């Protein structure tokens, strides 16, 4: 995902749990804090700034649906509100993209996991990576 963004002219930097020392990650696992859901990447291109929560282990190859935890979506909505106008994007393993608000919109009257712990969104609802972040060819030509 980082390579795909860089190929489109974005400067990318890691953030979130993967950047913390093991003791901090362990402590976060034991809490319900929204910090557990902090975005994985921050990226800039020109004057544009975005944050990305990488969902690369969720390609939805079997069901044609993404399962996004309710905790993740709730934290994403809070993050988006606190850091507006900087968007937060969920980028999935198949490089398709949704925002927290879109997850809520597409699941308000639709498929929900029977436990209520996940929002299930059809992959066809997601945006193509190039539509959100630009194409690699356009970045090379610029």
What are these regions (language model features)?
Residues 57-80:
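Mg2+/Mn2+-dependent nuclease catalytic core
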Residues 39-60:
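Conserved catalytic cores of phosphodiester-cleaving nucleases, focusing on short active-site segments
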Residues 77-110:
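Nucleic-acid nuclease catalytic cores
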Residues 1-30:
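Acidic-basic catalytic patches of nuclease active cores, encompassing PD-(D/E)XK
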Residues 100-142:
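Intrinsically disordered, low-complexity terminal regions enriched in charged/polar residues
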Residues 16-18, 53-57, 94:
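Short loop/turn segments at strand-loop or loop-helix junctions that form parts
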Residues 23-32, 60-68:
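Short, flexible/disordered intra-domain loops and linkers
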Residues 33-38:
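Glycine-rich, highly charged phosphate/nucleotide-binding loops
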